[in-house]
Amino acid sequence: MQGSVTEFLKPRLVDIEQVSSTHAKVTLEPLERGFGHTLGNALRRILLSSMPGCAVTEVEIDGVLHEYSTKEGVQEDILEILLNLKGLAVRVQGKDEVILTLNKSGIGPVTAADITHDGDVEIVKPQHVICHLTDENASINMRIKVQRGRGYVPASARIHSEEDERPIGRLLVDACYSPVERIAYNVEAARVEQRTDLDKLVIEMETNGTIDPEEAIRRAATILAEQLEAFVDLRDVRQPEVKEEKPEFDPILLRPVDDLELTVRSANCLKAEAIHYIGDLVQRTEVELLKTPNLGKKSLTEIKDVLASRGLSLGMRLENWPPASIADE
């Protein structure tokens, strides 16, 4: 086996052993030493917590007001029925939420096969038992809400948000959306030519039948790869801060000198010198203004006092004056 000492091995053999329709073993080798546990643990956590699926979230049973009651002619109490409904394996196509109905009467078991649904819904395990009717005159009618989601969402997390609008008799169910029921991984020794310090990763998993084990592994690997993409190129992906553009000049400098409410004599003297804006005025010095015809010390004092009341003074330096909005006039 030739190659750089810093070059990582890539898995070349992927073996999938389909034990049953819901049980499979996936073998991946060879892996660099330590990568068996690194990849195995990451895939295991994703498969258990992040796989999307469908689950029962709400149930309404005729004649039942709360989950701590019983129903005449039914062997199980309501809590046990809800627990059995949590194990319902449903595959839904093209929808995020569906309502299923179940109506059954007479002695015998009530199974998932008794559920009425449309063509977008598939009951994967129709033999799954929901409850048992023990009386010839007994019956049970229920409406079952199935939603698409990810991970595990307890009913308590939805109680407060839905309490005001949830009618009496609508029972909330802990939703376990993950189609993966069990997963374990094992790391064994592997050998390639003269190297004996390599890993072989063996993943064994079982699903509820709504997803093929091979497809589940593929989805988990895709999720992991997408999450790691951000580390491939470590450029700052944060959105640039939008800085509020500050005006180039104080707005008061753009106002006409008439807004200073000077005496007519002072105002006319300034206009004669082409001083039309306050920004024009503050750039003049006392000496320059005293050279203005008909503008004496009294008018100068008036101008200085008015500017001072607005936080301005004579002799100020303004870069890039006048602004384009004034220069174009």
Swiss-Prot record:
<dbReference type="Pfam" id="PF03118">
    <property type="entry name" value="RNA_pol_A_CTD"/>
</dbReference>
<dbReference type="InterPro" id="IPR036643">
    <property type="entry name" value="RNApol_insert_sf"/>
</dbReference>
<dbReference type="GO" id="GO:0003899">
    <property type="term" value="F:DNA-directed RNA polymerase activity"/>
</dbReference>
<comment type="function">
    <text>DNA-dependent RNA polymerase catalyzes the transcription of DNA into RNA using the four ribonucleoside triphosphates as substrates.</text>
</comment>
<feature type="region of interest" description="Alpha N-terminal domain (alpha-NTD)">
    <location>
        <begin position="1"/>
        <end position="235"/>
    </location>
</feature>
<dbReference type="InterPro" id="IPR011773">
    <property type="entry name" value="DNA-dir_RpoA"/>
</dbReference>
<keyword id="KW-0808">Transferase</keyword>
<dbReference type="GO" id="GO:0005737">
    <property type="term" value="C:cytoplasm"/>
</dbReference>
<keyword id="KW-0804">Transcription</keyword>
<dbReference type="InterPro" id="IPR036603">
    <property type="entry name" value="RBP11-like"/>
</dbReference>
<keyword id="KW-0548">Nucleotidyltransferase</keyword>
<dbReference type="GO" id="GO:0000428">
    <property type="term" value="C:DNA-directed RNA polymerase complex"/>
</dbReference>
<dbReference type="GO" id="GO:0046983">
    <property type="term" value="F:protein dimerization activity"/>
</dbReference>
<dbReference type="Pfam" id="PF01193">
    <property type="entry name" value="RNA_pol_L"/>
</dbReference>
<comment type="subunit">
    <text>Homodimer. The RNAP catalytic core consists of 2 alpha, 1 beta, 1 beta' and 1 omega subunit. When a sigma factor is associated with the core the holoenzyme is formed, which can initiate transcription.</text>
</comment>
<protein>
    <recommendedName>
        <fullName>DNA-directed RNA polymerase subunit alpha</fullName>
        <ecNumber>2.7.7.6</ecNumber>
    </recommendedName>
</protein>
<comment type="similarity">
    <text>Belongs to the RNA polymerase alpha chain family.</text>
</comment>
<dbReference type="InterPro" id="IPR011263">
    <property type="entry name" value="DNA-dir_RNA_pol_RpoA/D/Rpb3"/>
</dbReference>
<dbReference type="Pfam" id="PF01000">
    <property type="entry name" value="RNA_pol_A_bac"/>
</dbReference>
<dbReference type="GO" id="GO:0006351">
    <property type="term" value="P:DNA-templated transcription"/>
</dbReference>
<dbReference type="InterPro" id="IPR011260">
    <property type="entry name" value="RNAP_asu_C"/>
</dbReference>
<feature type="region of interest" description="Alpha C-terminal domain (alpha-CTD)">
    <location>
        <begin position="249"/>
        <end position="329"/>
    </location>
</feature>
<dbReference type="InterPro" id="IPR011262">
    <property type="entry name" value="DNA-dir_RNA_pol_insert"/>
</dbReference>
<keyword id="KW-0240">DNA-directed RNA polymerase</keyword>
<dbReference type="GO" id="GO:0003677">
    <property type="term" value="F:DNA binding"/>
</dbReference>
